Amino acid sequence: MGKLLRKPLNERIAPGVTLVQDINQGNSPLSYVGFRLIELEKGAVYQEALTDLECCIVALTGKITVSEGDDIFAEIGTRANVFEKIPTDSVFISGGRAFQVKADTEKARVALCYSPANRDLPTTLIKASDNSIEQRGKYQNKRLVHNILPDVSGVASSLLVVEVYTNGGNFSSYPPHKHDRDNLPAESLLEESYYHEINPEQGFIFQRVYTDDRALDETMAVEHQNAVIVPEGYHPVGVPDGYDSYYLNVMAGPKRVWKFHNDPDHEWILERD
């Protein structure tokens, strides 16, 4: 199965560009989802040529300029810190195209989210104001959601991207749910990656990834800028008191539909008044 918890790499890959996370088909059990996290110093440039993958570039912190052909999106990004809890700007780029990202502020943190390019689509700026915002859950199961690329969006061919905030003392991705069977309309098959940040940064959260038969069952203490791979199974997150959690989810599979199945042992939680 491979290691599900990924610690920061912090590798310098170009002048002023640091690779923090790199998840791909070659180093993980995933077939549909890829993820990179890069940090750029002011003026530094990251370049990439896409082949059979599409990419959503998310300006996590700082301001960046994204260029693809004649399309230039200058000084996008809305936050100095993800825990400002406001939506940010993103750019979608289809397969077979080359792009570059340049940092316009002293530092910029950028997420690169990948999935198979099933058809050619226009390069698109996804403004912060385009994100739909949801407050989900109740009791100790509350979270704030920013939908960047939900399944109702026609911007991408296979990619789903969402940001989730969970306050201390709460659980999210909870009751535990999974989406690892191509069994629509009951359930869709979507792989998933989690990129985590924690406030304050010295904190940690817990994430469990498990299947019904427990053939896969890993519980991880996840720290700031760690990533977690979810090739299958349920994947709840618990946040200790005193710390806030942020994570960026990337999902993809054979069909661009998010339909999950709750763990029947814990679904009763939803039935409370």
From Swiss-Prot:
Task: List the GO molecular function terms.
Answer: 5-deoxy-D-glucuronate isomerase activity; glucuronate isomerase activity
Among Pfam families, the record links this protein to:
KduI
Q: What is its EC number?
A: 5.3.1.30
Q: Enumerate the catalysed reactions.
A: 5-deoxy-D-glucuronate = 5-dehydro-2-deoxy-D-gluconate
Q: Name one GO biological process term.
A: inositol catabolic process
| Broadest EC class assigned to this enzyme | isomerase
Q: Where would one find coiled-coil regions in this protein?
A: none
Pathway annotation from the record = Polyol metabolism; myo-inositol degradation into acetyl-CoA; acetyl-CoA from myo-inositol: step 4/7
- What keywords are annotated for this sequence in UniProt? Isomerase
Q: Does this UniProt record's set of keywords contain Oxidoreductase?
A: no
Top-level taxon: Bacteria
Give the family this protein belongs to, as stated in its UniProt record.
Answer: Belongs to the isomerase IolB family.
Q: What does this protein do?
A: Involved in the isomerization of 5-deoxy-glucuronate (5DG) to 5-dehydro-2-deoxy-D-gluconate (DKG or 2-deoxy-5-keto-D-gluconate).
NCBIfam families per record: myo_inos_iolB
Q: Cross-referenced HAMAP family, in alphabetical order?
A: IolB
Q: Please report the name of this protein according to its UniProt entry.
A: 5-deoxy-glucuronate isomerase
Organism name: Listeria innocua serovar 6a (strain ATCC BAA-680 / CLIP 11262)
Q: Its encoding gene is what?
A: iolB
